[in-house]
């Protein structure tokens, strides 16, 4: 039980260091997950994502509101703020161990 509590506390601390004013209701933890193109239709407002681990590739690809003009964003060891309820997005192919944390509101 202590390790789960420590993990939760660590994730909250990580997000609060990045943006102390960002309020979130949910945290998604992914291991080696390559998300297909989608929109977060139930999310409210912006989200933060960070990629962690020993991997190559795995950028966050964000499209315009019409689902066109993809742009890759490097999220490895850095936070990226985006609105996944408006902009379709997906994970680029990657090799290695890739973890991601997504902080969002529902």
Where would I find each of the regions flagged by the language model?
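Catalytic core of non-heme Fe(II) oxygenases with the double-stranded beta-helix
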Residues: 19-93, 97-104
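Non-heme Fe(II)/2-oxoglutarate
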Residues: 1-19
């Amino acid at each position: 039980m202590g390790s789960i509590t420590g993990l939760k506390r660590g994730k909250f601390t990580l997000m609060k260091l990045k943006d102390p004013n960002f309020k979130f209701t949910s945290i998604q933890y992914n291991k080696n997950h390559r998300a297909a193109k989608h929109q977060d239709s139930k999310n409210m407002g912006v989200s933060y994502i960070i990629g962690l681990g020993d991997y190559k590739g795995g950028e966050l690809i964000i499209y315009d509101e019409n689902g066109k003009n993809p742009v890759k964003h490097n999220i490895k060891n850095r936070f990226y703020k985006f609105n996944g309820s408006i902009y379709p997005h997906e994970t680029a192919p990657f090799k290695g161990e890739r973890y991601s944390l997504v902080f969002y509101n529902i």
